[in-house]
Amino acid sequence: PHVTNQLIRQALHPYPDDLVIVTKVGARRGSDGSWPHARSRQEIIEAVHDNLRNLGLDVLDVVNLRLGGFSGPVDEPFEEPLTALVELKQQGLIRQIGLSTVSPEQVAHAQAITDIVCVQNFYNVAQRTDDEFVDLLTAQGVAYVPYFPLGGFSPLQSSKLNEVAASLGATAMQVAIAWLLHRSPNMLLIPGTSSVQHLRENLEAARLEPVSYTHLRA
């Protein structure tokens, strides 16, 4: 469970001044590969200190609190883990706090407790439940971090995306990323990147002109 942070440290430490590292707490890796909740006050504190140690940092730029589940946001109390993060922020161990897999109502409730700088939810050109939520966060100046840029596509939607990609000489992933980039100015993307070539392909998505795939919004 600590491998990713250790690899980041090996590759990038000492970190450049303009690098922002975002971590996530609220779940732990089970021995069976599952991700059960880990949201008690003590679990949150331990997770933050684990991140600090494995990354070789004295303070974490942003810590996202993971709520909900793989099926989406869940209406459940989260004051205990959020309050723990606020305490750690007051201690100078965290600079900013974000939320993951949450509803607009949960974000509003959290904002009554502390500042929220980002929201990480499932969103892409085919999964548009958060359309109004994205616009609300844009108006508030809160970053929106969509995950699974190709998740949840029907066969018809996948076929249409592939057609658009072929017409542009691009991959389906590049078109999906480009659509997100141009959807709203508060988008921060986290596409999976498994190799240097994969990274280059993802970066090429920024070259696509939005006029080429505007009809995908329909």
Specify the residue positions occupied by each region the protein language model found.
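Glycine-rich, proline-tolerant flexible connector loops at the mouths of alpha/beta enzymes
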Residues: 1-7, 70-72
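A short, structured active-site edge motif that brings together acidic residues
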Residues: 18-30
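Beta/alpha (TIM)-barrel catalytic core signal, keyed to glycine-rich beta->alpha loops juxtaposed to Asp/Glu
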Residues: 68-212
